[in-house]
């Protein structure tokens, strides 16, 4: 199986961070931006760094953009360019287009024109920061939909020394514990009699409201 290839269009702070992380993870990444200075900054980071206008169809074709597994439109300071680039990528047959949105209205437009995934980096980071500030237990969150997530959090004190069935997480809230990380061990799909311990890290799936309620328990 071939390694996934990514293209990141728009090398601002978000785009550059994305290029760095994907490259660090061992993937081939092409960085594209109309600004020569930004491209020069990524020459030593990306697999390929190209100065190009993403709204030029012939240029995108010449770059073989449709051959990339995922193309991320990370343009953040020009909504028109962001939207038109997304449209062009879909018209060129790119398999998966991920587009960065500035706000809800922008996101709705991106969804309407065919973006496969719309992301809100600033909003999501603000939510994550807010939750980490108000909760002593919250660690990480992966959004599966607008209403459901997989969340990682420390065992609240009120749940420590109780078995999963005794906590009522699944029966009362519909929250499923996928795994428990205990020191260097990971208990995958723990049974109902598994007892939670203080310091355990719980990985659970459920509605955002229920998960947030649990992480805020004392």
Regions inferred by a protein language model and the residue ranges of each:
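Cytosolic regulatory regions of ion transport systems
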Residues: 1-218
């Amino acid at each position: 199986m071939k390694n996934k290839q990514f293209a990141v269009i728009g090398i601002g702070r978000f785009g550059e961070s994305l290029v760095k992380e994907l490259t660090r993870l061992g993937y081939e990444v092409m960085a594209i931006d109309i600004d020569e200075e930004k491209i020069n900054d990524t020459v030593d980071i990306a697999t390929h760094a190209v100065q190009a206008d993403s709204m030029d169809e012939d240029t995108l074709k010449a770059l073989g953009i449709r051959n990339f597994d995922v193309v991320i439109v990370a343009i953040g300071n020009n909504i028109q360019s962001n939207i038109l680039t997304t449209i062009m990528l879909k018209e060129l047959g790119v398999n998966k287009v991920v587009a960065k949105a500035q706000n809800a209205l922008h996101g709705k437009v991106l969804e309407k024109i065919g973006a496969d995934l719309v992301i809100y980096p600033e909003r999501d980071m603000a939510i994550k920061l807010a939750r980490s500030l108000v909760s002593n237990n919250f660690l990480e969150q992966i959004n599966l939909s607008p209403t459901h997530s997989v969340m990682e959090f420390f065992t609240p004190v009120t749940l420590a020394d109780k078995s999963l069935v005794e906590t009522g997480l699944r029966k009362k809230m519909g929250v499923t514990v996928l795994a428990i990380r205990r020191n260097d061990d990971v208990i995958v799909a723990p049974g109902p009699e598994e007892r939670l311990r203080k310091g355990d890290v719980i990985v659970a799936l459920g509605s955002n409201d229920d998960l947030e309620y649990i992480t805020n328990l004392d």
